[in-house]
Amino acid sequence: MKTPEVLVVDDFLEQEAWDRLLNQVQCDEWTQSQPDDKYWHITDGANYKASKRFLRDAPFNDNYDIWADAIRAFADSEPAQEYVAGYTDIAMRCHGYPVGSKNPWHTDMGGVTYSYYLHKHWQINWDSMLLVLPKDSVEYKQMMRKLPGTKQQDTYAGTGTLEMFEQAEKQKGLIEHGMGYFVAPKPNRLVLINKNVVHGITRVDKDAGENVRLTITGFFNFFKAQVVNV
């Protein structure tokens, strides 16, 4: 599927490559996202992330080289170049969303990003759907406006910060428009999300049980001096 907002590719990896990559991420260093990581709000539930890597540092001499080769080949392909022409680097990190976790509405700070669904099994009623609003359908600014005298102390000091508590006004336009489409977290599916696309991820339902929504995600960087470190 190709739209102005997303490019979706199913059966992205061969079975052996998929198996080896899933095996590799289980040997990474993992941490739980903290409240200071304002991409997730306090009420969004616990989620987990592995260590981050960048394509520029490949080869890694482990099974992440499988992903580095695959995402580079994809980015250089004709379908993807419409979205990522001129990229200079690609970030890669595994995220885990267990039952009760979600990701709120955002625009990835206006950047081009991707998500690859690494988990082996998923049911449609387990939710954790990617929700997408049509481009330019709403006016939405991800960064919080700082009032006079406010000094930023968090890890987003170089880029601006995001609201922790006052989100209702920002989200008013989303509910007023109230229409879009979803992309299910189908195993072995890659989704490229275009720049300035408003999107969110619904909560993992309790029906998922012990199953965790696993993704390899990252930004495409376009400037030699720019490294989007999220």
Residue locations for each model-derived region?
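Catalytic core of non-heme Fe(II) oxygenases with the double-stranded beta-helix
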Residues: 86-230
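Non-heme Fe(II)/2-oxoglutarate
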Residues: 1-80, 102
